[in-house]
Amino acid sequence: MAAASSNGLVVPAAFPPPVNPVEEFVGPPTDPEEVRFEVGVVIVGGGPAGLACANRLLQLLAEDEALTERLGEVPVAVVEKGKVCGAHNLSGAIMRPSAMNELFPDVAPSDWPTYGEVPGEAVYLMLTGKQSVRIPTPPPFKNHGNYVISVAELSRWLADKAEKAGAYLLTETSAAKLLVDHNKVVGIRSGDKGRGKDGEPLGNFEPGSDVLAKATVLAEGTWGHLTGAAIRAFDLGTEDSQVWALGVKEVWEVPTPLTKVIHTLGWPLRTAAKYKEFGGSWIYPMGDDKVSIGFVAGLDYADVEFSVHDVLQQFKTHPQIRGILEGGKRIAWGAKAIPEGGYWAMPKLAAPGVVIAGDSGGMVNVPELKGIHYAMHSGILAAEHIYGQLKANSSDFSSYDAAVHDSVIGKDMFRTRNMKQPFSKGFFVGGAIVNAMVATKGRLPGGHWKTHPDKDQPMFRGGRAKGYPKPDGNYTFDKLSSVYISGNETRDDAPNHIRVQKEVPRELAEMWQWMCPAGVYEVPEDAEGDGPVDVIVNYTNCVQCGAITAKGGRLTAPEGGDGPLYQIT
């Protein structure tokens, strides 16, 4: 077993999960030819990127009868592990309208699934647990002309459009393996269903199937199981590591309408560089009677006791926030990791037979808190380049990578390429550097500021937990009651889809316990002192947020249909 770092602090990377992605999750088709499911294009992930791709591809095929016929009975299939498309989608969210306008030019914004245009905005610096000051809205936070949405609702709307256009939606179906033949991706294998917790077939067992396709689109979201395997198998990674943040969100019914979108910086995050606490909050109106509130923090933090879920509960105790929520009722909760590595951490986006789209490709603009329109734009580009190559009988989709970098996605992300990294120097120093970058549109300070894996951050006990409020079940909440309202219905006897080392230092076990918003990891009550801990993994609680992959473990494909059932997140 690897040791802790030389300064005596525990480093999660020193205790890697027992997994070999290429050996386990990449391989040739195994089903006999007569039982294989053959489609034209298989899209993994029923979120904005995958469904934008499906819709655009079907628009193109509607004008090309010859290619549609060549692609077979099912020209476009979408594989989605959630119970429905959108079940695992969560975001703030404010959406730029550019991709919707491009994809559906004949659909009026009033017919989109939104809560209307941003009505106004404010940014506050939270000084303490009782004080705040409004500050001028930084340029990246200006949202005039953008729309407040639920990304879960958007995904369901896009899925309905795609299905009506001819897409075959395979919901409750995980994509467990990337099928590769002669160094070319030829599809995916779906996961088994009906296995017990030890992997044994139960009475309702259904084996997975080979889904063969002329093109495969990996649009799996923030942590892509097959995307990670493809990056390893085809050497698609860059010299910079992807890094993540974790967002935890609640939706509240409130008695008084909120008339503007709000972002905050500062408290309850600590500003000293040693804690490496980077993030902030949002509060968005969802019509007259609901608000979305959430907190996002980088997963490169250093304190063992840091918990984004509990930081959100602490944030809600501020008098200014109570003034918005009190008298209301929490009706939804969820959590999701967010790729924050920016331009330098984007992988190569194409290999023979396959492309990567959306969050799986790290397409998030960190300072602007935007990614949904990038996901959709990348899906549109993927569809157009796949269509062109299939028409030419080619599986070389490398032109897609260049197209993304030449598009609004690549241009925006290059401009903001160094705007996360400076905050490793602390809130005030990092903020000053980023202000210079914003003012010069990324030119100064220029250069290449490297990212470092979240799991390489040494961890220490910094006393974070003493600031968390005790859950009262009405205004502040524990993790398990939160998982309950996420709609999570994972079977108690389902197989474990989480890989972590079981025997780890107590600090690491405690870090996982605090980190996880769903209460998956637990330190046994009888664990002695500071010795190694046999971590309890309550995997049926998992809402598949992806944070464990950033901090030393690894999610694998769950059984299709497991996990949350997000409705308005």
Question: Which residue ranges define each predicted feature?
Answer:
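Predominantly flavin-linked oxidoreductase catalytic cores and closely associated redox partners
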Residues: 59, 69-72, 152, 156-157, ...
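Glycine-rich Rossmann-fold phosphate-binding loop(s) that bind the pyrophosphate
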Residues: 45-48, 81, 151
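C-terminal auxiliary extensions adjacent to catalytic cores
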Residues: 423-474
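Active-site-proximal substrate-binding core of FAD-dependent oxidoreductases
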Residues: 71-74, 87, 362-368, 380, ...
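FAD-binding beta-loop-beta segment adjacent to the flavin cofactor pocket
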Residues: 335-366, 481-493, 503-515, 522
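Iron-sulfur cluster-binding cysteine motifs and their immediate structural context
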Residues: 509-569
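Extreme N-terminal leader/targeting segments of oxidoreductases
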Residues: 1-41, 56-75, 195, 482-506, ...
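N-terminal FAD cofactor-binding segment of flavoenzymes
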Residues: 56-60, 71-129
